């Protein structure tokens, strides 16, 4: 039956370099700047509003604006976050801020 064959019998073994010259495994990557890691103020506010959209305890959010949902939750005594109200009042005409995640989907 012969000897057991290996893939290296047909293809030569090629050792790859481990990285660019002067780079060793023990070195850490350089620290990124503070502004590249932190989100902008607008992105932070939009993320807060997305989390508000996903919070089921304030009721459904389809078919109404975020401000209407916040007001309804406030009237029902559900204590929605005041930060959400402040963000919505700061951007009264911007649909990115006023409309929920699902405003583009038909009812």
UniProtKB/Swiss-Prot annotation:
Region of interest (Disordered), residue spans: 1-40
Record field: compositional bias (Basic and acidic residues): 15-28
GO biological process, alphabetically ordered: DNA synthesis involved in DNA repair; DNA-templated DNA replication; positive regulation of endothelial cell proliferation
Key words of the record: DNA damage, DNA excision, DNA repair, DNA replication, Nucleus, Ubl conjugation
Disulfide bonds: none
Motif (PCNA-interaction protein motif (PIP box)): 1-16
Main location: nucleus
PTM comment: Ubiquitinated; undergoes 'Lys-48'-linked polyubiquitination in response to UV irradiation or treatment with an alkylating agent, leading to proteasomal degradation. This modification is mediated, at least in part, by RNF8. Ubiquitinated; undergoes 'Lys-48'-linked ubiquitination in response to UV irradiation, leading to proteasomal degradation. This modification is partly mediated by RNF8 and by the DCX(DTL) E3 ubiquitin ligase complex (also called CRL4(CDT2)). Efficient degradation requires the presence of PCNA and is required for the inhibition of fork progression after DNA damage.
Cell compartments where the protein resides: Nucleus
PANTHER family: DNA POLYMERASE DELTA SUBUNIT 4
Function: As a component of the tetrameric DNA polymerase delta complex (Pol-delta4), plays a role in high fidelity genome replication and repair. Within this complex, increases the rate of DNA synthesis and decreases fidelity by regulating POLD1 polymerase and proofreading 3' to 5' exonuclease activity. Pol-delta4 participates in Okazaki fragment processing, through both the short flap pathway, as well as a nick translation system.
Subunit structure: Component of the tetrameric DNA polymerase delta complex (Pol-delta4), which consists of POLD1/p125, POLD2/p50, POLD3/p66/p68 and POLD4/p12, with POLD1 bearing DNA polymerase and 3' to 5' proofreading exonuclease activities. Within this complex, directly interacts with POLD1 and POLD2. Directly interacts with PCNA, as do POLD1 and POLD3; this interaction stimulates Pol-delta4 polymerase activity.
Protein's recorded name: DNA polymerase delta subunit 4
UniProt source species: Mus musculus
Gene name for this UniProt entry: Pold4
């Amino acid at each position: 039956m012969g000897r057991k064959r290996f893939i290296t019998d047909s293809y030569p073994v090629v050792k790859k370099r481990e990285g660019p010259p002067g780079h060793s495994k023990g070195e850490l990557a350089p620290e990124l700047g503070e502004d590249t890691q932190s989100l902008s103020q607008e992105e932070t506010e939009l993320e807060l509003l997305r989390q508000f959209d996903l919070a089921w305890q304030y009721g459904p959010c389809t078919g109404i604006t975020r401000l209407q949902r916040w007001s309804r939750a406030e009237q029902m005594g559900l204590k929605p976050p005041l930060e959400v109200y402040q963000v919505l009042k700061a951007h009264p005409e911007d649909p990115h801020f006023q409309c929920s995640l699902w405003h583009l989907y038909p009812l």
